[in-house]
Amino acid sequence: MTVFTSAALLAALAIVARAHTPSKPDLSRCEAAARTETGWVCGARRRAVSGSEYASFLAVPYAKQPLGELRFQELLPAEPWDNIREAKVEGPVCPQTDVFYGRIKTASGGMSEACIHANIHVPIEALPDPKKPPSLDAKAAPGLPILVFIHGGGFAFGSGDTDLHGPEYLVSKGVIVITFNYRLNVFGFLSLNSTQVPGNAGLRDTVTLLRWVQRNARFFGGSPGAVTLAGQSAGASMAQILTLSTGARSLFRRAILLSFSDYFSPSAQFVKTINSLFFPLLGINATLPADEIHQKLIETPINEIMDANKKLIDLFGVTTFTPIVESYQPGITPILEDDPEVLLDSGRGRDIPLLIGFTDAECESFRPRFEQIDIVGQIEKTPALVVSPRLTFLSGDQLPVVAELIYNKYFNDTLDLDGFLRLCTDQFYKYPAFKLASKTSGETPVFMYRFSYGGVDSAWKEGLGLKFEGAGHVEDLTYIFRTNSVLGPLGVNESTRRDDDAKMKNKMSDIIVNFMKYSHPMPGPLGAGQWPKTAARRPPQYLEANGPKRIFKKKNPTSNLQHCVYKSIYAIQMKMEIQQMMHFRPLYCVRTH
């Protein structure tokens, strides 16, 4: 039974903490040591780009591994260990089929369901002396700000590994960086609408990690009251959902959403569709009672589940199982009890400062995948595919109207991949960012940027073998985290580089760290004037990050037709708005300068 906020689980955690006070092992051969609530860990000392050192603790379990009967269950507390645990090598990634990252994601630790681990990176001077008990006095030792980062990957692939999420740019600026793995695809987002599998296991894993951070932050020199939750792509969508969730309240203070998207539908109708396609691939009758399906899934070998999951990914393109709105289940506190937009409109999450980022050419990064699945050919057969999955509840006579609006704006009577990529960028990334900023601004600071710096030597483009103008999906992330799989070992001269790429990495990491510390990406009189927060009930402004010398260029999304078109396309929450939309023509939008 899922009870992540229940008194029973909290009591169990308290018992574990009291019952196991880690005995101090021999730490003489350990470069960097830290205690946790379940035992001591031995990490490694590494060098950041500034030349400073940090302690890196890899593959630290934040819960018991979900094996066997625990495959789809709420995570249980991690089991304690007596000797010191080596934490110098990354653990396995969660089971997945990667159709996007290519050689950028190395999975150096293999792949396994025993993947529930966190990676903790701490400036060496902040790490508590292992010879002394950690200070629990916040006034005497306030602790460093903590960035908890949720990796992206369409809810289906990816990891918190340092191949893409190297902390070298951030830890040198006085913050702690924590990345982690969570269950993916069917293991993380299957819903049987039952007490055994209510859905959103990957989100529950994230809440479990956040609770672990609250209990263990002091052991690593961090402040449990200064946690910023960040994510990229699917990870940003998860972070945004958790800003709305009562189950995650008080576990973090700020949120950073990079390439946030609402490209998935959290509806029960979508759940039924995905399940009806998936279960037959495993020889399971989709009409069986939920408890019987659950048992069959537990008994099914992992390789068979992954084979079926790959077939489903090939059918859908990238994303399959996703976060869903949970129905009421006795004894279970839902992560997501209603559509995120409904919760936003009710005022939920407006007390959390937000930094929202997107790139100017998001979907160029997906060009190889869209070519592989022949997305243009699929649209020719099914024109309604140009419409966002969030609008799939439209009736048959409304879908063609929305599709016509999209065709008029993006294709000019010629359906091609270039037009689709522009549509994809606007529909799944740019407009959701505008919409979210508009809905959440006013009561708390909300800032937004568009990253359009293409780079001199882009690690992202090199890693995927891509060439295009501007910045694609994930590309801004590579100026915040170091792409170690492409860049290789940190060079001795890297900290002294002064080219535009190095300056941009410094600028972007400054933005993240400033927001973590001050709830403003550019604090001080200069920044307040050049990067104002988004005003309530007004079209959101964003800053154009297109180079280290031109990062302060303000933009307004209403300066082109894009915002007008999508405001009309998405104005479908009420019947009246649908009727208004059906009479809309892009010709009537007025440009503002």
Give the location of each predicted region.
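Cleavable N-terminal signal peptides of Sec/SRP-targeted secreted and luminal proteins
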Residues: 2-19
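Serine-hydrolase-like catalytic core of hydrolytic proteins
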Residues: 3-7, 105-294, 344-367
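Non-catalytic accessory segments of hydrolases
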Residues: 15-203, 224, 330, 489-510, ...
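Mobile gating loops/cap/lid regions near enzyme active sites that modulate substrate access
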Residues: 49, 422, 430-593
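A structural signal for well-ordered alpha-helical segments within the folded catalytic domains
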Residues: 55, 113-116, 168, 204-211, ...
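Short Gly/aromatic-enriched secondary-structure transition segments
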Residues: 56-62, 66-79, 368-386, 390-394, ...
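Non-transmembrane alpha-helical segments in soluble domains
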Residues: 147, 207-210, 214, 275-279, ...
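Substrate-gating cap/lid region and adjacent catalytic-acid/histidine neighborhood
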Residues: 299, 303-500, 518
